[in-house]
A protein has these predicted regions:
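N-terminal binding-site loop/beta-alpha segment at the start of enzyme catalytic domains
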Residues: 1-55
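Active-site mouth loops of central-metabolism enzymes
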Residues: 1-9, 59-69, 93, 98
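A short, structured active-site edge motif that brings together acidic residues
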Residues: 52-65, 89-93, 123, 146-148
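Beta/alpha (TIM)-barrel catalytic core signal, keyed to glycine-rich beta->alpha loops juxtaposed to Asp/Glu
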Residues: 95-259
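Structural motif
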Residues: 17, 21, 81-82, 114, ...
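Glycine-centered flexible beta-alpha turn that most often forms the glycine-rich phosphate-binding loop
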Residues: 26, 87, 119
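Short, acidic/polar
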Residues: 5-18, 67-82, 102, 127-131
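CE4/NodB-like, metal-dependent polysaccharide N-deacetylase domain
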Residues: 71-93, 109-113, 135
Length: 259
């Protein structure tokens, strides 16, 4: 999103449809379209008739902008592109060369100034999270956004248990494994029985996980409606057993994966 101005009108329309249909969490980043995605979201928000207060906007910071000074500068740029006075959740996109202490200090200052409501990280493994927790105010981390889906269950080995013990939620990006999951027989079988789509089954599986928030994406209105429909899918014990057989939980030494 935000990479081509020729389709911006379509992207804005899809976002406005999603907001009108009841989607409240919208995830973006300064990396997406080099700020273009934030601009598209900002344009969409301007036409929603005051829906901003109902929405939970997530954006992410480049790691090379994560010094104490540059974090605040980057946040101001994102706020301007989004056309809003605050970001609900601001994440470090992945770990870089700047110290976690400096980044956290900047996040806490942005919170005090009302520029952001919460902060977190993305693409951190368990060791990274332990290091984060060791710095001053590191325990204020609200979430960790990671690559997690039925085919990529590595967070279950140690990351999810560690975060749950500390009240840190997990945001699952690429919940459909970049579309690779939709042709898997086990998903198709459950979907056919329930009268839904394989994508909706994959999303429903994530939604039943404690403290996990799935963040699927779609560039089409039909895709948005399919995502919304996943909330009504109820998987039973037999469904979960079938999925666990087709997509076994990880071994204890599973390592982090990213897209």
């Amino acid at each position: 999103m935000g990479e081509a101005r020729t389709i911006r009108k379509q992207e804005v329309a899809v976002l406005r449809h999603a907001i009108a249909a009841g989607i409240t969490l919208i995830d973006t980043a300064e990396m997406y379209g080099d700020g273009g995605a934030e601009e598209v979201l900002g344009e969409a928000l301007r036409g929603t008739g005051g829906e901003r207060d109902r929405l939970f906007i997530v954006s992410k910071l480049y790691p090379w902008n994560a010094s104490r000074h540059d974090t605040k500068v980057a946040c101001e740029r994102s706020l301007k592109r989004l056309g809003t006075d605050r970001i609900d959740l601001y994440l470090l996109h992945w770990r870089g060369e700047h110290s976690l202490a400096d980044t956290v200090s900047a996040f806490e200052e942005l919170k005090r100034d009302g520029k952001i409501r919460h902060w977190g990280v993305s693409n951190f493994d368990t060791d990274d999270m332990r290091e984060l927790y060791a710095v001053t105010d590191g325990s204020n981390c609200a979430t960790n956004q990671v690559y997690y889906n039925l085919a990529r269950r590595w967070p279950e080995a140690s990351l999810l248990p560690w975060q749950r013990e500390r009240g840190i939620s997990t945001m699952a990006y690429s919940p459909l494994d970049q579309g690779k999951l939709i042709n898997r027989p086990s998903l198709a079988s459950i979907a056919a029985r329930l009268g839904v789509t394989p994508s909706q089954v994959a999303l429903a599986w994530l939604m039943h996980e404690k403290d996990v928030v799935a963040i699927p994406k779609s560039s089409r209105i039909e895709g948005v409606d399919e995502i919304l429909g996943a909330r009504r899918v109820k998987l039973d014990v037999a469904d979960i057993a079938l999925l666990n057989k087709a997509f076994p939980p990880p071994k204890s030494n599973a390592s982090m994966e990213t897209t």
